[in-house]
Every structure is written in C-alpha cells, then in structure tokens.
Amino acid sequence: MTEEQEYWRAETVAFYALQSLHGVGFRTLYKIAVQGTKFRELIKTEDPKHFGKTLRITLPTSIFNSEEEWNNFKKELWAKGTSIARTYSQIDVKVVFFDQDAFPNRLKSINEPPMWLFVQGNLKNLHTNSVAIIGSRKASDDGYWLTKLIVAGMANKGLVSVSGLADGIDQRAHIESIRFGVPTVAILGTGIDSNYPKGSETVREQILSCGGTIVTEYLIGQSYSGHNFVQRNRIQAGLATSVIPVEWKIKSGTAHTVNFAKDFNRFLVMPYLPDSNLEGSELQAITSYRKGKIFQVPDQTNDLVNFIKNPLIEESEESPTVDLSNGERQISFDL
C-alpha cells in the first residue's frame, strides 16, 4: 500500500468511526469537511473538549478526568471505524473524498458539492460521459416508451446513464440500460445500506452485476426525506453531461433537477410526441434555456440520438434564469 493509499484508508476509517457516534450527523460532518479539517486528525486530537465541540456532542465526564480514559475512547472509536470499513469493503463499497483524484471532476465544480461519495460497483462510470434520465414516479406508457427509445439510442456509444432508482421513469431508465448494455449509475437519497424505494433490491442487484454503480453522499443508516431527495438531484445533474427529463411537471422533484442542470450549465434535452402541447410549461422550460433542445419523435429520432452522443449548441453559454424560486430550490446545508 502506498503512502497516499494509507492516508485515504485512515481517513475512511476515521469517517466511519465519527459517523458511528450518537448525535453526529450529516450536516456536522459536512461542515467539518468544508472547513478543511481531516477526520483522522480530529480523532488524533489530544483535546477532548475540542473533539466534542467540533462534533457538537457531549462526551462522558470521565474522559476529561483521565488521559488514559481519553486514549481508550479513541482506540475503541478507531476499532469501531475499522470494523465498519471492513464490513462495507466486503460488499465493494468505497468512500471517495472530494480531494482524491478518484472523485469525479464534474462534481467538484458545482455549487455545494458533495464532500464524499459512497460508491458501490464500478468507479470508472463516474468518470465517463453520462446522461441523466429522469422523470415522474407515476409514469405513463408514453413515458416508458420514450425512456426505452432514449436508452436504446445510447447503446454502443460509450455513454453511461444516470438516474435515481425511484419508481417510474428512474427505474425504467436503469432497467432499459441493463437490457441494452449501457452502464448505469443510481444516485440514492438514502444511506448506501438502505434499499429505497421498497422493492428496488432486484434492480439494484442487476445494476451492480451488469457493471453499474450505486452512489450516495448520505451516511450509513441515514433515511430518506424530501430535502435529501432535492440534494440528491443536484448530484444527478452535476454528474451528467446532459439531463433528459422524459415525463415531468413544472412543480415536481424533476423540476429541481432541471434547474440544477441550468445552474451547472449542463445540456437539457426533452423528447416529445406529436400530440404534445408546445406551449406547455415543461417544454417551454427547456426551449427558453440556451443549452436546451427538444425533439419530436419519432420524426426527429436520429437528431435526438446524435445530439445525445455529441451535444452542441451554437449559442452563448450564459447562465439562464431558473424557473423555481430560491425558496423552492433551497438545498443549503445550513452551515
């Protein structure tokens, strides 16, 4: 093991150890990481007061009365982190930190980037040109057909699909990707140990067995929430070269992803059927964006597929005005 590998192995153990402490949650660890403090250095500290204050937890009184007690506490905590790290390593779960070369460059440049990623499966997929395919949980037959068309058009083109493993369009994007041999990445809104939504275990197993990847920034044991899903959507948009909202409403979770795509200067692509209302809010949200393109299918299927493979807009790439208010899109970690 190289010195660099040993460094990040220790950081991973420390990260697992700290999140095992009662009262230590995502926001606390995120703030620590943003400030540039390394987790292993925090565990090494000789000052229990600094340790407790930084993590916003109350330590047992005995720890402050004896150096031996403090050292024993740290040794036990490190052993706990080592055990957790070993457990997740056995199921091919890695932690990739923001400062590592293995961290996706596309996510380093977004607003409020993840400071770490739990990655299960093929890490290479996070460094390959990818297309986020997103949409309604209550999809129609038309939505499923459009999803199949898009993914089939991505086959054998060196692209990766990205979605959120949710019911509806998301799961169909993963399933069609598996069918057509397109590597697929599922971004979770929960901890890596959680199977959500209920019944998604089979799709998740298929994703991994076919060379895909499961990704989340959330901690072990962390459950879902509406706020978490909005934050998850920024990772979908950030990781992708192009974002394709297949079937959605302007007031929906998918709309958050659309607006993140605009914030991050990604391409937005939307296929539509001949009977669609071109004045509808959803299509207008795409056409009003300088890097947005819509395609009527089946007539423009070839143009759609070619654009997905090689997106190009011969216009200025100025940042557009987003469609949702700041309050509706708020993702701040309240640091």
Language model features: what each stretch is:
Residues 2-9, 98-335:
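Glycine-biased, small-residue-rich flexible motifs in mid-sequence functional cores and linkers
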